[in-house]
């Protein structure tokens, strides 16, 4: 808001240094913890994706942050100084564009399938498989840390999967509480063995 409104209220820029300092401090912590979580995803998700795709595809993950952060897994104080450097280098551009160009909101998780960027080259089925692999990997990490599975919500994930991949997902989510939504599938009772809720005209039965 400081940058956005600074043209009409130049005095707002007086608070920019203090705000940037606070943002860099919080951003450094966020980048640090994100990087360590993504490192764990990198250990869990590719194996799940390999099983999911029948060994035909290779999933890789990479955390991309601002250019001055040389190691996202470094200590927060190191990242803090590097974020401040990025802010200083881009201060003029930020004021001119009235947009914040430095910080964890600019980060991205790069997902690649067989060395190609998923967001540019993956099919809808490949994208769905990669997303499910990440979700299942995060679920396993949660279980490792807490000793129990989180409640898992899967919204209409089975309709676009072939029978083999449907079976893989259903076998992989055993344990814990799982909610799966779908439009129509007469095979669900046999596949799941759980309770079935029907929603019609806003009424659950």
Give short role names for the model-derived ranges.
Residues 6-151, 160-164, 168-171, 177, ...:
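Conserved NTPase motor "head" modules and their coupling/switch loops across ABC/AAA+ ATPases, GTPases
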């Amino acid at each position: 808001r400081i940058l956005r409104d600074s043209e009409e209220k130049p005095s707002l820029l007086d608070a920019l240094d203090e705000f940037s300092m606070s943002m860099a401090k919080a951003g450094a912590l966020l980048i640090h913890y994100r990087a360590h979580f993504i490192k764990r995803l990198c250990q869990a998700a590719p194996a799940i994706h390999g099983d999911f795709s029948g060994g035909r595809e290779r999933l890789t993950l990479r955390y991309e942050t601002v250019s001055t952060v040389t190691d996202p897994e470094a200590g927060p104080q190191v990242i803090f100084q590097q974020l401040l450097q990025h802010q200083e280098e881009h201060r003029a551009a930020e004021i001119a564009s009235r947009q914040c160009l430095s910080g964890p909101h600019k980060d991205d998780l790069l997902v690649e399938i067989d060395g190609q960027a998923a967001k540019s080259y993956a099919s809808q089925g490949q994208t769905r498989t990669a997303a499910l692999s990440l979700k299942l990997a995060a679920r396993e990490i949660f279980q490792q840390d807490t000793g129990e599975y989180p409640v898992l919500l899967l919204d209409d994930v089975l309709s676009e999967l072939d029978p083999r991949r449907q079976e893989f997902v259903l076998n992989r989510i055993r344990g814990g509480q799982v909610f799966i939504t779908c439009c129509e599938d007469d095979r669900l009772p046999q596949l799941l063995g759980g309770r079935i809720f029907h929603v019609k005209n806003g009424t659950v039965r």
